[in-house]
Amino acid sequence: KELGFAKVSEEKLAVAKKIRDFVIGGGFMFAMCSATDSFDIALSAEGVDIAEAMFDGDASEPNYQSKINYNKTFAFTDFDLVRSPITYEFSSIDMTSKRNIPKTADYFSLIEFSAKWDPVPTMLTQNHTTLVKGFMGQTTSFDRETVKTNVLVLGENKTNREARYIHGTKGKGMFTFYGGHDPEDYTHRVGDPKTELDLHPTSPGYRLILNNVLFPAAKKKKQKT
C-alpha cells in the first residue's frame, strides 16, 4: 500500500509490465525456473483476478480461465491455470509433474545453428557439448504444446515433448527462458546450501547461463561497404 497498490497482485503485475516495456524498448531479458511462466501468466491475466482469497484477501473472478489473453504473453500460449492453492504449480506450461524421467536419464539436447545465418542462437547455445544434464525447479521445463510457434527452441528433450531452453523477440528486444533452478543441484530446495561454483568449472548448464550474461555485451560489427 505504501507504493500505491491495493493488493500485492497489482504490484506484481506492475513489475511484470515494467519488464515487458523494457524488452519491447530494446532490452534483453533472461529468466529461469518459475520466473519464466509466472511472468507470462501475469501478463496474460492483466485486468483479471486469478488470485484466490488466501493470497490477496478476496475471491478470484468466476471463469477466469476464459478471460486469459495469450496475445499479451512473450513465449507461451493455450495454457490452463492451476486453480488449487495446495498444488505446487502455476499452469500446464510446466512439465515437472508430467515428466517420468529418472535422474540418470534426465538430459536435454542443444540445437545446432549456423554462426553465419543464426548468430544469436549460436551465441546462446555455445558449449563444449550438445548434451546437457537435466535439473529440477519449480518450473523444470516447458510443454512444447504451450510454446508459441514464433519462439525458437534452443534446447529440448524431444522424446518427452519438452522444451528446456527457448529464445524469442518482443518489440525491439529479446528474451531467453531457461527451465530449472540449479544445473549442478538436481533437486535444489528452499533452505539448501548454495552450490559451490568453483567445483563445477566446466558445467554445461552453467555455461548456458553465462552465455546469456555475456550476450548483451556482444556488439554487431559494422559491415564494410
What are these regions (language model features)?
Residues 32-152:
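An acidic, glycine-rich "communication" segment
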Residues 7, 20, 27-31, 123, ...:
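Conserved aromatic-histidine-acidic binding/catalytic patches
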Residues 20, 36, 46, 57-61, ...:
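Carbohydrate-binding surfaces of carbohydrate-active enzymes
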